[in-house]
Amino acid sequence: MKKLSVLAISSFLIVDFLFPGYHHNSNSTKSRNLSELCYNNVDTKLFNELEVRYSTNQDHFYNYNKTIRLLNENNNEKDGNVTNERKKKPTKAVENKLKQPPGDDDDAGNDEGNDAGNDAGNAAGNAAGNAAGNAAGNAAGNAAGNAAGNAAGNAAGNAAGNDAGNAAGNAAGNAAGNAAGNAAGNAAGNAAGNAAGNAAGNAAGNDAGNAAGNAAGNAAGNAAGNAAGNAAGNDAGNAAGNAAGNAAGNAAGNAAGNAAGNAAGNAAGNAAGNAAGNDAGNAAGNAAGNAAGNAAGNAAGNAAGNAAGNAAGNAAGNAAGNAAGNAAGNAAGNAAGNAAGNAAGNAAGNAAGNAAGNAAGNAAGNAAGNEKAKNKDNKVDANTNKKDNQEENNDSSNGPSEEHIKNYLESIRNSITEEWSPCSVTCGSGIRARRKVDAKNKKPAELVLSDLETEICSLDKCSSIFNVVSNSLGIVLVLVLILFH
């Protein structure tokens, strides 16, 4: 019986020595991936993420990097490389019950707060940004728009302006042109008109001149003829002789008398006759002559006159015409020009305006969002207090420290296999690890973080004291049985 007792106690001690955690509660149903727990001093951020890297000097097995997830994802992500025996049932996700400091929720609260804050901030920011952006955008847009608008506007404006300007310019130009044209036209017209007028005037003048000439000629002829005829005929036959003598005498006397009398009479008669005849003749002659002369004269005169007249007339006409034309042209041109100019101007202006507006808007929005998140956390905390104390291992103070994790993984570097290692602690929360299937042939020195699977393991009952007491009692019993056998 004593030998059986010694054998039983010895077996118990040997098993306990070889498998120190076999009688402990190593159930990992409450295990969690390290990336889901908080382990820093202020309980507000995730535990610093670890990256396992190979170091040439073998002094450090782990390197810490905040840009890589802690330790590793669970092996379900690579089901294609894992056998059915290695697949495990996904652990139930445990909600993080850590209390968060008020106003420091960066998730739901900030999302809702930012949405509300951005709306208010953007409204104020855009108002200021658009004002500055439109000012710069309109300046550039109008410059391009006016160019196209004025081109179309000036075309229509100049057309109307030139019409009004030419009317006034032509009036002044024609006056100067006609003066020069009439001078040349009258010269040619008078030549033709005088020729026709003199013909008619001489005819009328000769009739009047001959009448006056004959009167004087007859008086002189009769005086000489009468003297000779009277002397011979007076005595005997003044009565009969005078009749025959006068006829012959008058004929000869009139011929000589008329020749001398007509010369003087015609000169005086023509002068008066021509004056009256020229007036009537010139009127008819000038009409025909001026028509032909003015056509050539006006052509040359108008060219010079219009040039000067149009310059002054167009200036006044274009001013009024351009005003109306530019208004319509600029409206269309500015619309297209402003669209492009405002786009660039508003982009720069809104950027600056939104930055300032969002800062103020987000501050107010985040305050409301964080208050809502705080209330939500308080409700979660209230529910947590009603749960069993077994979930206290979620507290960061109960989780393994960074130094503990580093030291444990370093200690099992050479012995880690594809099976789960023992929990790193015998009381509280620790970690355990194993190799992934695709890293089973790697040397220990070549292992990196991506080659390992890790998870949190927790023991509901601490057994440190029990181990000491039970081992001590076992040794005492063995010694007693041996000594008093």
From Swiss-Prot:
It comes from the Eukaryota. It comes from Plasmodium brasilianum. This is Circumsporozoite protein. It is found in: Cell membrane; Cytoplasm. Residues 371-390 have a biased composition (Basic and acidic residues). The N-terminus is involved in the initial binding to heparan sulfate proteoglycans (HSPGs) on the surface of host hepatocytes. The N-terminus masks the TSP type-1 (TSR) domain which maintains the sporozoites in a migratory state, enabling them to complete their journey to the salivary gland in the mosquito vector and then to the host liver. The unmasking of the TSP type-1 (TSR) domain when the sporozoite interacts with the host hepatocyte also protects sporozoites from host antibodies. The TSP type-1 (TSR) domain is required for sporozoite development and invasion. CSP has two conformational states, an adhesive conformation in which the TSP type-1 (TSR) domain is exposed and a nonadhesive conformation in which the TSR is masked by the N-terminus. TSR-exposed conformation occurs during sporozoite development in the oocyst in the mosquito vector and during host hepatocyte invasion. TSR-masked conformation occurs during sporozoite migration through the hemolymph to salivary glands in the mosquito vector and in the host dermis. Keywords: Cell membrane, Cytoplasm, Disulfide bond, Glycoprotein, GPI-anchor, Lipoprotein, Malaria, Membrane, Repeat, Signal, Sporozoite. Residues 103-114 have a biased composition (Acidic residues). Residues 72-122, 363-403 are annotated as: Disordered. Residues 97-101 are annotated as: Region I. Residues 1-20 form the signal peptide. Residues 463-485 form a propeptide. The gene is CSP. Belongs to the plasmodium circumsporozoite protein family. Sequence repeats lie at residues 109-112, 113-116, 117-120, 121-124, 125-128, 129-132, 133-136, 137-140, 141-144, 145-148, 149-152, 153-156, 157-160, 161-164, 165-168, 169-172, 173-176, 177-180, 181-184, 185-188, 189-192, 193-196, 197-200, 201-204, 205-208, 209-212, 213-216, 217-220, 221-224, 225-228, 229-232, 233-236, 237-240, 241-244, 245-248, 249-252, 253-256, 257-260, 261-264, 265-268, 269-272, 273-276, 277-280, 281-284, 285-288, 289-292, 293-296, 297-300, 301-304, 305-308, 309-312, 313-316, 317-320, 321-324, 325-328, 329-332, 333-336, 337-340, 341-344, 345-348, 349-352, 353-356, 357-360, 361-364, 365-368. PROSITE patterns: TSP1. Residues 411-463 form the TSP type-1 domain. During host cell invasion, proteolytically cleaved at the cell membrane in the region I by a papain-like cysteine protease of parasite origin. Cleavage is triggered by the sporozoite contact with highly sulfated heparan sulfate proteoglycans (HSPGs) present on the host hepatocyte cell surface. Cleavage exposes the TSP type-1 (TSR) domain and is required for productive invasion of host hepatocytes but not for adhesion to the host cell membrane. Cleavage is dispensable for sporozoite development in the oocyst, motility and for traversal of host and vector cells. One of its GO terms (cellular component) is side of membrane. Disulfide bonds join C423-C457, C427-C462. Glycans are attached at T426. A lipid is attached at C462 (GPI-anchor amidated cysteine). PANTHER family: GLYCINE-RICH CELL WALL STRUCTURAL PROTEIN 1-LIKE (PTHR40903), HYPHALLY REGULATED CELL WALL PROTEIN 3 (PTHR40903:SF1). It holds the Pfam family TSP_1. Essential sporozoite protein. In the mosquito vector, required for sporozoite development in the oocyst, migration through the vector hemolymph and entry into the vector salivary glands. In the vertebrate host, required for sporozoite migration through the host dermis and infection of host hepatocytes. Binds to highly sulfated heparan sulfate proteoglycans (HSPGs) on the surface of host hepatocytes. Residues 109-368 are annotated as: 65 X 4 AA tandem repeats of G-N-[AD]-[EA].
